[in-house]
Every structure is written in C-alpha cells, then in structure tokens.
C-alpha cells in the first residue's frame, strides 16, 4: 500500500493519491439514476455530499455548471453523486431520501437540483410539493418518503466516504472509468469545495494520459473498496 500527499497551498487543497488495485464489489454503474454524463467517459468524478451543506451548495452553484459544460456534456467525465448526510437523522437524511424517491420515478436530478436551489425549504411538505410540481406519482412518492425506503443505501454511501478518509462534505474522488485506480494512475481524493481550476488541473492531467483502449467501466462502489483499509486520512 502506497500513498503520497500533495499540498496545493494556494487553494488550500489536499490531494491524497491511493495506489491500491480495485477489489471486487457489487452493483452496476448503468442502473443508478445518480449518474450524469456518458458511461464511456474516460474519467469518473464521484461527489460525496449533503443537501444541507453550504459548501456543497457552493460547489453546485459555482463549480458543477462549469464542469458540466467543459467535461460532462462533452463526454470526458461522468459525474456520480453519493449521499453523505452529516447527521444520522434530520433534514439532511430526509432530503437524501426525497431525492432517492424521485429517482425511483426517473427524476433524481431534477429533485437534486431543486433541493440545492431551495435550501431554506427542506421539509417533508416542501419535498412532496416539489414531487407534485415534477409530475411524480404523489402516492408512490409519499409512501417511499414516509417509509424511508432508501436509508440503508444512503448510509452505505456515507460509509464509502469515510473509507476514503473524508470527515466532512463535500468530498470528491477522481478515478479512471475503465480499470479503476492503479499504482501508475491512482485515485485522487479532493476534500472540500475547491475552485474549478483545481478540478480542471487534475482532470486534464488524467485525460492527457488516458489510454485509448476501452474496457468495461469500473463500478464506483467497487472502486471505493480499495480505500477500506487505507491508513491515509484526509483532514
């Protein structure tokens, strides 16, 4: 197991390079509504986030649109959202459940965007109002939300984040879509809502050395397994 810390003092960003091979995991990247961009994009960016987090909202408002325009919409990066509610219960968990329940009806991203845009109105009545405005089946949504049907999956996401060493939100992982992290091209962990330029620098570096051959996309859940026993912690 190897690791190298690189400090970028100008932007106060710490990058942790993890050089373990990927281990087997479950799930499929193609059946998860929390993915934006092409499945064939050479780079995958995973965000661990909380709908109540101010810095997460800052990323959503200021940085994600630029990443979307330059990398996601152009087929260079696929973007994966993972839940990291900072508390075990409360608004953050409720919002994550609401987004998942909307996703069950094929409207994850509209709800995701609405929740980050309406952070002063994160309550059960508002969630159900958003679902109605989106044309969702209100009975199905209400049942899903009231029964907290996605709690286990939400907290599995949070466990992934802590395995990477994240102790706050947002946190980001950059990995190769095909093959996952290797010693030659490790995963890059980026803690915090760093400027767009920091994301662009790392993405461009990975794109410049991206292999031309294509294989099966790496499952984001599988890639996170490489950090489960890592001694490297991000602060």
Residue ranges of predicted features:
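Soluble periplasmic/extracytoplasmic beta-strand elements of cell-envelope proteins
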Residues: 44-47, 78-81, 171-173, 189
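Acidic/histidine-rich, surface-exposed loop or edge segments in extracytoplasmic proteins
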Residues: 46-51, 184
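Bacterial N-terminal signal peptides
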Residues: 9-20
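Bacterial N-terminal signal peptides that target proteins for export
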Residues: 1-10
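A short beta-strand-turn-helix
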Residues: 26-43, 71
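C-terminal cap of thioredoxin/glutaredoxin-like
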Residues: 62, 129-235
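Structural alpha/beta surface segment adjacent to cysteine/selenocysteine redox centers
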Residues: 41, 49-132, 137, 205-210, ...
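Signal peptide processing junction and immediate N-terminal pro/mature segment
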Residues: 22-24
């Amino acid at each position: 197991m190897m690791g190298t810390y690189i400090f970028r003092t100008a932007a106060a960003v710490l990058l942790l390079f993890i050089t373990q091979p990927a281990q087997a995991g479950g799930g499929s990247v193609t059946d998860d509504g929390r993915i934006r961009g092409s499945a064939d994009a050479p780079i995958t960016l995973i965000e661990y986030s909380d709908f109540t987090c101010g810095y997460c909202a800052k990323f959503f408002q200021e940085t994600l649109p630029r990443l979307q325009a330059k990398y996601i919409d152009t087929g260079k990066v696929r973007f994966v959202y993972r839940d990291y509610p900072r508390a075990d219960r409360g608004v953050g968990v409720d919002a994550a459940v609401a987004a998942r329940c909307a996703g069950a009806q094929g409207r994850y991203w509209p709800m995701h965007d609405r929740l980050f845009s309406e952070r002063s109105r994160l309550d059960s009545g508002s969630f159900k109002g958003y679902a109605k405005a989106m044309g969702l089946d209100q009975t199905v949504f209400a049942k899903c939300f009231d029964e907290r049907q996605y709690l286990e999956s939400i907290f599995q996401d949070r466990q992934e984040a802590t395995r990477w060493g994240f102790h706050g939100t947002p946190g980001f992982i950059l990995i190769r879509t095909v093959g996952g992290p290797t010693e030659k091209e490790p995963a890059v962990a980026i803690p915090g809502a760093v400027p767009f330029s920091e994301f662009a620098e790392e993405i461009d570096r990975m794109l410049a050395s991206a292999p031309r051959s294509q294989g099966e996309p790496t499952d984001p859940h599988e890639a996170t397994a490489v950090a489960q026993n890592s001694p490297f912690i991000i602060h």
